[in-house]
Curated annotation (Swiss-Prot):
<dbReference type="InterPro" id="IPR003769">
    <property type="entry name" value="ClpS_core"/>
</dbReference>
<protein>
    <recommendedName>
        <fullName>ATP-dependent Clp protease adapter protein ClpS</fullName>
    </recommendedName>
</protein>
<comment type="subunit">
    <text>Binds to the N-terminal domain of the chaperone ClpA.</text>
</comment>
<dbReference type="GO" id="GO:0030163">
    <property type="term" value="P:protein catabolic process"/>
</dbReference>
<comment type="function">
    <text>Involved in the modulation of the specificity of the ClpAP-mediated ATP-dependent protein degradation.</text>
</comment>
<dbReference type="Pfam" id="PF02617">
    <property type="entry name" value="ClpS"/>
</dbReference>
<comment type="similarity">
    <text>Belongs to the ClpS family.</text>
</comment>
<dbReference type="GO" id="GO:0006508">
    <property type="term" value="P:proteolysis"/>
</dbReference>
<dbReference type="InterPro" id="IPR014719">
    <property type="entry name" value="Ribosomal_bL12_C/ClpS-like"/>
</dbReference>
<dbReference type="InterPro" id="IPR022935">
    <property type="entry name" value="ClpS"/>
</dbReference>
């Protein structure tokens, strides 16, 4: 009984096709949007608490939100970005602030 086997060699097309189909997961930016009611110190607190920024970096991002209308807080995989948006939104509502946090594809 003889069986025919097709051997995969390093230069075969099959191996190359398998490798080219693998892609890294998409990344998403978590963005804070400016409003006229949320205090600046609360925005800094959010950036330190949920995004682990130090005071200087949090202040820079807060000022960018204030003057440019929005700023990126961090870039994450989809699941982590969704979690960050939900955490910030819930924390803002608990403290009665209308801070808007969104995510967009990087």
């Amino acid at each position: 009984m003889s069986k025919n086997f097709e051997w995969i060699t390093p230069d075969s097309d099959l191996l190359e096709k398998e490798i080219t189909q693998i892609q890294p997961p998409k990344k998403y930016n978590v963005v804070l949007n400016n409003d006229d009611y949320t205090p600046m110190d609360f925005v800094i607190d959010v950036l330190e608490r949920f995004f682990s920024h130090d005071l200087d970096k949090a202040t820079q991002i807060m000022l960018k939100v204030h003057y440019e209308g929005k700023a990126i807080c961090g870039t994450y995989s989809a699941e982590i970005a969704e979690t960050k948006v939900a955490q910030v939104t819930m924390y803002s509502r608990e403290n009665e602030h209308p801070l808007l946090c969104t995510m967009e594809q990087a």
